[in-house]
UniProtKB/Swiss-Prot annotation:
Its main location: membrane. It is a single-pass membrane protein. One of its GO terms (cellular component) is membrane. It comes from Arabidopsis thaliana. Pfam families: p450 (PF00067). Its cofactor is heme. Belongs to the cytochrome P450 family. GO terms for molecular function: heme binding; iron ion binding; monooxygenase activity; oxidoreductase activity, acting on paired donors, with incorporation or reduction of molecular oxygen. This is Cytochrome P450 71A15.
Amino acid sequence: MEIIIISLCLATILAFLLLKPLLNRTVAKDNLPPSPWRVPVIGNLHQLSLHPHRSLRSLSHRYGPLMLLHFGRVPILVVSSSDVAHDLMKTHDLKVANRPRLKVIETILNGGREVVFSPYGDYWRQIKTVCVVHLLNKKMVQSFAKVREEERSVMMEKVEKASSDSSPLNLSKLLITLTSDVASRVSFGKKHSNEASMSDFKNQVRKITELVGGFPVSEYIPCLAWIDQIRGLYNRAEEVSKIFGDLMDKVVQEHLDATNKPTKDFVDILLSFERQSKDGIEVRRSDIKFIILDIFLGGTTTTNSLLEWTMTELIRHPECMKKLQDEIRGDATNLTIYRSHEEVEDMKYLKAVIKEGLRLHPPFPLLVLRLLTQDVKLKGYDIAAGTQVITNAWAIQRDIVTWGIDAEEFRPERHLDSPLDFRGTNFEYIPFGSGRRICPGIGFAMALVEVTLANLVNRFNWRMDARLSGDEYDLAEATGIDVCRKFPLIVFPSNA
């Protein structure tokens, strides 16, 4: 009899434990955002494709712009409209300013001691101040104008050669070389293409991007942690972190050994904070390498993606290309003269073209994950602390409610009389994010994008190989957190 009673008690307890989540969900379901049915253990992961920004938009069309998913055991709030983004990143910005602590990122990035993934707090505020005030301010951006001009000239010579030979040009490769070399010279004082060590640095950065953009199964489904072990996720993270750290240690030591340098790069400036603890801010030697990594990734990924996609859209829309060429060329008779930043900074159609490129192809379609640190009420729904937040900028910027029935079309004219800007105050248009976590390097990226695009369009006419065109080829996206073209942009430039 005692055995039966004990068995019944155990069965009751077990049933309660198993049914408790269902009971809780039933009681609270009226206060939770809409959510698709989820599979035990994996949650809603089976509903994601290789391009999650697209599959999440499809789900939002069915369940609404504020949607609750589960990646394994972790609740994920998906934001797909501007009004929800406004409430989240303005009204509740402080409550959602943190980042999830992911082991793979902390393994690579020294515990997350940099700008993008660092937890919100005093340290993050300090290093963001360093970046915004001392590295990426307007004066610093202007001081590197000569670097941009020199690397632009190198690029233009390569395009000129392809034009003279009537040979195909891999514009994607040329643009990533340009952006990498500019970022390298600004950060380290030298560029990738000149030294083997810098080429190795570039390779490690690519590996870091792939690891950060991957899905760490163990973080969301602990019982499947063996999958990460089999694919060697954390071993690769430790390996790339060590190799990258060793490379950066050499760079830092070279800067410490150098004397009487005529110009200061970012490493020099960061080292001055380590030596002097300037403005009450302390930057450790070990932190410098990862702050530089943030700047390098932001300076290459964002800029390259924007240039590549905007050139793609211009070539696909010859009427837009002609309007831009007419604006840039104006009454000039000598089109071989390079256009300076001062000449192009007030060109309205150029800015409209760039804005439209960013609207359709934001460099990071899904903004970097945020973590809710307090319970909030959002659009009448109760959202619990500990929920991770995905903002689908790609979906927001193609929303027909905001942008009209032609939201999927490349039409720069929509920006000519529009007050919308990408500085984070217009939530219909957030390619760089918004609030405390907005990208601090917008000015740095735009300075290179404007002058590069203007000179490519001014000096040459462009066409694609007819065999390598069409939407399936032109607009196919690669996988990863930074969505660039799946296929390289192969073009034929000709002298204007």
